[in-house]
Amino acid sequence: MTQAAIDYNKLKSAPVHLDAYIKSIDSESKEGVVKIRGFANTISKDRAGDVIPASAWKTSNALTNYMKNPIILFGHDHRRPIGKCIDLNPTEMGLEIECEINESSDPAIFSLIKNGVLKTFSIGFRCLDAEWDEATDIFIIKDLELYEVSVVSVPCNQDSTFNLAKSMNGHDYTEWRKSFTAISSKAVPAQERNLSELEKLAIALGYVKE
């Protein structure tokens, strides 16, 4: 199986988290509520080399289920709802969002958002269809289902495997890493392969078997 096929299967089998930024905060809204606006996702290439074109947000699967219960979470934690989405608007630039964050849900997080310390959105979604563009080495996500929108403290790491680790549970991540390593040339030592430092460390510590 090629690396492209492995990455495609990863997209199809696990929730994915991508980031964008909060662009405005309205602190003059009703007491105990702050309204935030921005892009939950943009059409730009993300750190993992994936792109969600504007057309993907207009499919019948993309937003229907989420809008039945448009909760905003903190840090992708389903136990920490902090507000609700009041408007989602697919545009040519990406998925524009407007939310109300409630102070009563988490006063500390509310304060950090209101004071501009927390200013990043992240979405969790399931990829339903994608294609790999060999010329640009990116995955174009053509159809998806939005699971949730979160306010997060730190955007996804540049290392795509770290991004994947956050979007899978520990067992699934370990199994994926094993299958990833199995694709590599068995006759070539880890030190001589084109591996990231994270991959070499995982092999050295025994988390991934050669």
Swiss-Prot record:
Pfam families attached here?
Peptidase_S78
Q: Name one GO cellular component term.
A: virion component
Q: How is it modified after translation?
A: Cleaves itself autocatalytically to yield the mature form of the protease.
Q: Which UniProt keywords apply?
A: Hydrolase, Late protein, Protease, Serine protease, Viral capsid assembly, Viral capsid maturation, Viral release from host cell, Virion
Listed GO biological process terms? proteolysis; viral procapsid maturation
List the source organism.
Answer: Escherichia phage T5 (Enterobacteria phage T5)
Prosegment residue ranges: 1-23, 167-210
Domain of life according to the entry: Viruses
Q: What is this protein called?
A: Prohead protease
Q: Where is the active site?
A: H76, S122, E148
EC assignment:
3.4.21.-
Q: What does this protein do?
A: Serine protease involved in capsid assembly and maturation. Cleaves the major capsid protein, the decoration protein, the portal protein to yield mature procapsids competent for DNA packaging. Acts as a trigger for assembly of the capsid protein.
Subcellular location field: Virion
Tell me what effect the entry lists for E148A. Answer: Complete loss of protease activity
The molecular function terms in GO held by this entry are: peptidase activity; serine-type peptidase activity
